[in-house]
């Protein structure tokens, strides 16, 4: 059994990096510890320019770099020195003049950055597929019993500290090896994803000409947290995050206080945060079981998020119990105090949290308080996934949204300016409600939400019931539907409840009947031409 604590010193290191962050200082410290340094190409030149003594690999092997740098380190003196087992292969290594290499510091050609450049050709992408680098990384990782592999500049300091204390333990080398295999797996996955979108044989194809989805799908996520259980107590669970998230999200959020996030907390917080991101003016979203149960938008000069919270809570105070609350502005002390004094809440998330708000929430030690950072005004493209038994559904994110100019009035009466504002508000909310989704809204406040019903008319009925139960007036309110009305009954029910304007995608075979129902009731109706199913 391998000794987990015995420290192995480093006498010879090979350094060959594309990302040269911190490499000069790292090499200088190694040299100061008496480590002989081998290096290649640009890395060798950089070290020599900064006065770090190093031996160029071409001089060490007696073979020059060739083929425009395609062949640098693919030589038995390099790979024998890395792969050679010190206890079994010493005689063979000595016979062939192969010196052991105890540490390999390598990172790879910037393939992802290359293919992300507009106009990148297939030929350019191919030349940025690293061969020697991954080979050395995998060799060193395989032989981690005797060799340390470093693929991330963030690990330089820790490695140096260990070497100053006598060497790296087996446990450290094993961890570095695991990171190395994770690194090469992600790298190869990127290459496979890219090439899988290429029209075969198109040597001059650019990034813009690629298919939307590759032949095989490769993605890497890093475990951020083991969870007590999953959606239910009998299920095991963990939370994995992207290696480089594109924008502020629940995955990037910093927990300031409270109990550990549960599986359902993460899912519901994501739903709340993604919904509140839809609004430019100060907004509050309250979510329960992944559905918005209260949403409001209030301009800063009319009360901002403090007032928005009151209105969102008023939509459905029963469902808000034990919910998730998200804001698109800094959480202030007054709003935080109102929350903790009024209701039981699982999670509060905002771009930032004031010191006064932190103090207020601290009175409820179990409340999970998250700070996620600010997101850009333009939503980033990305992919959504849904696991099915034996497969994976992949689609582009639903970041589609409409503006007033996109609305098509289909009834005799056009909506008023107030109705238009409320229609667009309700439409943004409906996008985040489970289908079939109906949202009643008035003055940029939800007054009733009907979610997840198998028939659209029942979602409309539930929205009306919710509004009545909350004591909120429906007369003069608007209605949003995430998909078209297949029959006129949803419009008839809304008219009876007092709805005066409707927003929906349109596209039903019975659109004319639905429009006629709206005209009979004196309602305004607009089509968006965009559906927002959410399953």
From Swiss-Prot:
PANTHER family: BIFUNCTIONAL PURINE BIOSYNTHESIS PROTEIN ATIC (PTHR11692:SF0), BIFUNCTIONAL PURINE BIOSYNTHESIS PROTEIN PURH (PTHR11692). It comes from Azotobacter vinelandii (strain DJ / ATCC BAA-1303). SUPFAM superfamilies: Cytidine deaminase-like, Methylglyoxal synthase-like. It catalyses: (6R)-10-formyltetrahydrofolate + 5-amino-1-(5-phospho-beta-D-ribosyl)imidazole-4-carboxamide = 5-formamido-1-(5-phospho-D-ribosyl)imidazole-4-carboxamide + (6S)-5,6,7,8-tetrahydrofolate; IMP + H2O = 5-formamido-1-(5-phospho-D-ribosyl)imidazole-4-carboxamide. Belongs to the PurH family. GO terms for biological process: 'de novo' IMP biosynthetic process. Its EC number is 2.1.2.3, 3.5.4.10. Keywords: Hydrolase, Multifunctional enzyme, Purine biosynthesis, Transferase. Residues 6-151 form the MGS-like domain. GO terms for molecular function: IMP cyclohydrolase activity; phosphoribosylaminoimidazolecarboxamide formyltransferase activity. GO terms for cellular component: cytosol. The IMP cyclohydrolase activity resides in the N-terminal region. The gene is purH. This is Bifunctional purine biosynthesis protein PurH. Pathway: Purine metabolism; IMP biosynthesis via de novo pathway; 5-formamido-1-(5-phospho-D-ribosyl)imidazole-4-carboxamide from 5-amino-1-(5-phospho-D-ribosyl)imidazole-4-carboxamide (10-formyl THF route): step 1/1; Purine metabolism; IMP biosynthesis via de novo pathway; IMP from 5-formamido-1-(5-phospho-D-ribosyl)imidazole-4-carboxamide: step 1/1.
């Amino acid at each position: 059994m391998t000794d987990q604590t015995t420290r192995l010193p480093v006498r010879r290191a090979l350094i060959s990096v594309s990302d040269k962050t911190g490499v000069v200082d790292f090499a200088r410290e190694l040299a100061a510890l008496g480590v002989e340094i081998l290096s290649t190409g640009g890395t060798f030149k950089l070290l020599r320019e900064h006065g770090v003594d190093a031996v160029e690999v071409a001089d060490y092997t007696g073979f020059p770099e060739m083929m425009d740098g395609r062949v640098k380190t693919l030589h038995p003196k390099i790979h024998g020195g890395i792969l050679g087992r010190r206890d079994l292969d010493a005689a063979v290594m000595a016979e062939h003049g192969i010196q052991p290499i105890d540490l390999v510091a390598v990172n790879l050609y910037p393939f992802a950055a290359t293919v992300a450049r507009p106009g990148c050709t297939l030929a350019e992408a191919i030349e940025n597929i690293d061969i020697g680098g991954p080979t050395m990384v995998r060799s060193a990782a395989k032989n981690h019993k005797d060799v340390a592999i470093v693929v991330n500049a963030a690990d330089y300091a820790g490695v140096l500290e260990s070497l100053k204390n006598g060497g790296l333990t087996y446990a450290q080398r094993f961890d570095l090896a695991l990171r190395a295999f994770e690194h090469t797996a992600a790298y190869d996955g990127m290459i496979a994803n890219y090439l899988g979108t290429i029209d075969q044989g198109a040597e001059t194809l650019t990034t813009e000409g690629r298919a939307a989805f590759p032949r095989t799908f490769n993605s890497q996520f890093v475990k951020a947290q083991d969870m007590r259980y999953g959606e239910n107590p009998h299920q095991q669970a963990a939370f994995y995050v992207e290696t480089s998230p594109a924008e502020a999200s629940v995955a990037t959020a910093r927990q300031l206080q409270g109990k550990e996030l549960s599986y359902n907390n993460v899912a519901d917080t994501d739903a709340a945060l993604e919904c509140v991101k839809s609004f430019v003016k100060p907004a509050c979203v309250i979510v329960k079981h992944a559905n918005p149960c209260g949403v409001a938008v209030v301009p800063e000069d009319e009360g901002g998020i403090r007032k928005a919270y009151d209105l969102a809570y008023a939509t459905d105070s029963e469902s808000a119990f034990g919910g998730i609350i998200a804001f698109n502005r800094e959480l202030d002390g007054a709003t935080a105090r109102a929350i903790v004094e009024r209701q039981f809440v699982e999670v509060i998330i905002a771009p930032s949290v004031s010191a006064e708000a932190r103090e207020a929430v601290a009175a409820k030690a179990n409340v999970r308080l998250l700070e996620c950072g600010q997101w850009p005004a333009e939503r980033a493209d990305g992919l959504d996934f849904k696991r099915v038994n034996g497969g994976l559904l992949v689609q582009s994110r639903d970041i589609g949204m409409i503006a007033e100019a996109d609305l098509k009035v289909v009834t005799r009466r056009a909506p008023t300016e107030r109705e238009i504002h409320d229609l667009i508000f309700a439409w943004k909310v409906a996008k985040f409600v489970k289908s079939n989704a109906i949202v009643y809204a008035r003055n940029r406040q939800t007054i009733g939400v009907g979610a997840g019903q198998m028939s659209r008319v029942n979602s409309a009925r539930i929205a009306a019931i919710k509004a009545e139960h909350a004591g909120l007036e429906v007369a003069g309110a608007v209605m949003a539907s995430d998909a078209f009305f297949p029959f006129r009954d949803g419009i008839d029910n809304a008219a009876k409840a007092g709805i005066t304007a409707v927003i929906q995608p349109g596209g039903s075979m019975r659109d004319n009947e639905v429009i006629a129902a709206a005209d009979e009731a004196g309602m305004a109706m607009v089509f968006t031409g965009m559906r927002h199913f959410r399953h």
